[in-house]
Curated annotation (Swiss-Prot):
It comes from the Eukaryota. Residues 45-53 are annotated as: Complementarity-determining-1. Residues 78-115 are annotated as: Framework-3. Keywords: Adaptive immunity, Cell membrane, Disulfide bond, Immunity, Immunoglobulin, Immunoglobulin domain, Membrane, Secreted, Signal. This is Immunoglobulin lambda variable 5-45. GO terms for cellular component: extracellular region; immunoglobulin complex; plasma membrane. Residues 20-44 are annotated as: Framework-1. It comes from Homo sapiens.
Length: 123
């Protein structure tokens, strides 16, 4: 049985001022069911990924975005209610990026994926 490649789309956003953190994402990614996909959310220069929580959302056509997870560190992360563990977060400090890893891709994972950052001075 031949598998149709899975297409994952991303939002690119790189506008704003220094008072607003700015993110960029690749426009699309293709992968096959059963494979893994790594989605990146790169912060613009001058904004350190280490100080931010990265939030990930999935949106399917005709539906509102659904919260997947947030990730700041291994000790500061949260999985959305009912979100399978095959969705996980991490960071790449050298690339100044947050990462959403989806393992064991399934056809229902075809969607738009959005990242958002949140910075809190509270510990």
């Amino acid at each position: 049985m031949a598998w149709t490649p899975l297409l994952l789309l991303f939002l690119s956003h790189c506008t704003g001022s220094l008072s607003q953190a700015v993110l960029t994402q690749p426009s699309s990614l293709s992968a096959s069911p059963g494979a893994s996909a790594s989605l990146t959310c790169t912060l613009c220069s001058g904004i350190n990924v280490g100080t931010y929580r990265i939030y990930w959302y999935q949106q399917k056509p005709g539906s509102p975005p659904q919260y997947l997870l947030r990730y700041k560190s291994d000790s500061d992360k949260q999985q959305g209610s009912g979100v399978p563990s095959r969705f996980s977060g991490s960071k790449d400090a050298s690339a100044n990026a947050g990462i959403l890893l989806i393992s064991g891709l399934q056809s229902e994972d075809e969607a738009d994926y959005y990242c958002m950052i949140w910075h809190s001075s509270a510990s």
